[in-house]
């Protein structure tokens, strides 16, 4: 119970800070929360769950969410493309197989954890590519005032949520442009930064030895 109270207090401070930033610079809310989730989130995972009601309240009040879903959009689709870039660059069969499943989980299922824990944290350098891409996308999303018209707009299968019931074609176009930006930036950053995939070779050898 004490830990839960501490987490609630932490989440309240995070939300208050993000709201204060948005008061001064409305476009900066998304990049700030992306930065917090990719830094503080490393040692305090799960704080995003407490912020979901913010999106629900925004959808009820104004008909769209321009913060929480956009944050998820940047930090879920980006890992999918990071995995795709890793899969096409590596020569390790085990990593290719892992990256493919991670890519599909993120892009089609809206689940980023396989990429985060199975690729980014394990090899470290892809995490830097992920951070650069997600943060730069968040800045653009904030400047374009990207809006999601229902909860769940953080996978390619739900991209139509950016069109909305009133057919906001400009917003939908911006969402598609940002998806393209994440794709290009993911490939550029992964290939420029590189990665050491030797750990997957060791994992494959250990698995083979265990099978014997």
Predicted region positions:
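Pore- and pathway-forming membrane helices of multi-pass small-molecule/ion transporters and channels
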Residues: 47, 51-55, 75-82, 104-109, ...
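Hydrophobic alpha-helical segments of integral membrane proteins
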Residues: 10-25, 55-59, 103, 120
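Alpha-helical membrane-inserting segments
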Residues: 14, 38, 42, 46, ...
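Transmembrane alpha-helix interface/packing and boundary motifs in multi-pass membrane proteins
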Residues: 35-48, 59-63, 106-109, 141
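Membrane-interfacial loop-to-helix junctions in multi-pass transporters
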Residues: 21-34, 63-71, 169-173
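Transmembrane alpha-helical segments and their short flanking loops
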Residues: 114-212
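Helix-loop-helix junctions within the multi-pass membrane cores of secondary transporters/permeases
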Residues: 56-134
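Short, small-residue-biased leader/transition segments that mark boundaries at the very start
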Residues: 4-9
